[in-house]
Amino acid sequence: MKVEDFDFDLPEELIAQTPLLDRTSSRLMVLDKKSGDIKDQHFTDIISYLNEGDALVLNDTRVLPARLHGIKDETGAHIEVLLLKQKEGNAWETLVKPAKRIRKGATITFGDGALKAICLEELEHGGRILEFSYEGIFYEVLEQLGEMPLPPYIKEQLADQDRYQTVYAKENGSAAAPTAGLHFTEDLLAKISAKGVEIIFVTLHVGLGTFRPVDVEDTANHKMHSEFYRLTEESAERINKIKAQGGKVVAVGTTSIRTLETIASRHDGKLVAESGWTEIFISPGYTFQAVDALITNFHLPKSTLIMLVSALSDRTKILAAYNHAVEEQYRFFSFGDAMFIH
């Protein structure tokens, strides 16, 4: 299919720049994936669509405050570093600006010297492998010195960094939030659990590739970025049992879907304990083996994520729903409203 087939007109003012005061006060568009019927509701209405014996699968990754500002030791030049992916030991793949100032062997100091880095390798497109040195625990140092790496379409400063974390975030490693999960509070999850719905966690560390535009004309030629995922034995067994008993598997976010479908596609539809890297690209024509329904935000035109949701329903129904969302002034992207495709 052509990438252009997934385009739609989006007024810039519908791109949410800040989160709502209350996480659960977002709107919820409910889309019947087969008929295309649309209902405009509130996010807390999600409870009525979840039944006893269903599974609600959430991604418990935690966003790192991965943007660092430092000084090149040799010249005093200001350097911005964005952590992308942990390599061996204290080495990280990073994006450096301005990259031309940091060559192999160059050193950078952050803050008052609590964190230092040396460039081990130069990569293309401003990428650098940096090895960090510090006292104590790396993630605690990051909390002191780093900033949240908000998506490029969000222009306003975030007053409270916790609003770009889910309330259940636990596993450090993401460069961006699994934003469908931002709508949940502990109270809402407790109400869902009390209804007999099983709350199950997976882990997928979201990379910055999630914001990278698709730069080919035909979707068949697109190569996905890789992201680390993990599913525990307990979670795999619980989901398999629910499916065997006829319960629905409802994924919260495209990252949860990518985790479950990666594993199911390798094991004849079954889920097993597994960790690794996935480059799964889900687009129309894909046959889902693990997931029945999806809670997600509204995605960018021509993005791999709108292709994924089109695979769960179909392209014409999704684009009709998106056009309805524009007409009804839904809020889009990371801090925007939600959609339930079932």
Swiss-Prot record:
InterPro entries: QueA, QueA_dom1, QueA_dom2, QueA_sf. It is an enzyme of class 2 (transferase). It comes from Listeria monocytogenes serotype 4b (strain CLIP80459). Monomer. Belongs to the QueA family. It comes from the Bacteria. GO terms for molecular function: S-adenosylmethionine:tRNA ribosyltransferase-isomerase activity. It holds the Pfam family Queuosine_synth. Signal peptide: none annotated. Pathway: tRNA modification; tRNA-queuosine biosynthesis. GO terms for cellular component: cytoplasm. It is found in: Cytoplasm. This is S-adenosylmethionine:tRNA ribosyltransferase-isomerase. Transfers and isomerizes the ribose moiety from AdoMet to the 7-aminomethyl group of 7-deazaguanine (preQ1-tRNA) to give epoxyqueuosine (oQ-tRNA). GO terms for biological process: queuosine biosynthetic process; tRNA wobble guanine modification.
